[in-house]
Amino acid sequence: MGKMSVNLLGIELDNPIIPASGTFGFGYEFNELYDINILGTFSFKGTTKDPRFGNPTPRIAECPNGMINAVGLQNPGVDKVISEELPKLTKVFHKKVMANVSGFSVEDYAYTCEKIDKEDCVGWIEVNVSCPNVHGGGMSFGTSPEAASEVVRAVKKVTTKPIIVKLSPNVTDIVAIAKACEEAGADGISLVNTFLGMRIDLNKKRPVIANKMGGFSGPAIFPIALRMVYQVSHAVKIPVVGMGGVSSAEDVIEMMLAGATAVEVGAANLVDPFACKKIIEDLPRVMEKYKIESLQSIIGGCE
């Protein structure tokens, strides 16, 4: 059997599969279905300085080959995440976990990251500058190289753990933003978050989502996400975590050939809670089929 392990910023993962933030809760919920220690790691629910109740309902709309969501970063706030959620997580997950942090000001990001950084179970901090669902924050940082850089510099001053910046695809030039984050000190880049989309209820003649618009994800976005991962990984020297419409072991191999060191799986978890388990179990078959002896060796292998 081929070697599935990869090294992400100094930490060895048994495999490159990472459930994406917002699709896997705080992990322990999924441990009732299967042993989540088979995962490379996972990115837990997006955490903010203060508790957030999220957007009004309805928050989810189905689409052909995908879905739109506008949950709005619902979470109990960083203090409760540390005091209540992480203890439940560490009882069942015995590897380093990826924290996911959002904010509505540079100070918010720094405050939350500084607190999360002190937790032993956290191996990486994924700084989400790309959430498209919250008015006045999140997305505005990720659509400007200057604003994204400012967040990265502030977070790097107060943390010791690797910082991975999660980018929005809803920009004119994602490569410019990735390079700006690298220059500001980011240790890695993850991309892409969801694409901004909407659906209209023909009977009511109103948007299906109460927030009007939300993040479109699912298999339909995979080719666009793959292209962006390829472009960014060829433009920066830091590791890239690829995501966007990944739903099979073949998709994972494509992402890695495009330049991803590890691969996040998002919407597929909402369709099938066993999605990541199935992908991990199928990887050896796909590796054998395409004569891949080591996943680490194929990173960026597409010319």
Regions found by a protein language model. Give the residues of each.
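Short acidic/polar active-site loop segments enriched in Thr and Asp
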Residues: 39-40, 45, 95, 122-125, ...
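C-terminal helical cap(s) of enzyme catalytic domains, especially alpha/beta-barrels
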Residues: 55-64, 200-214, 256, 268-293
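Short donor-sugar binding/catalytic loops of nucleotide-sugar-dependent glycosyltransferases
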Residues: 246
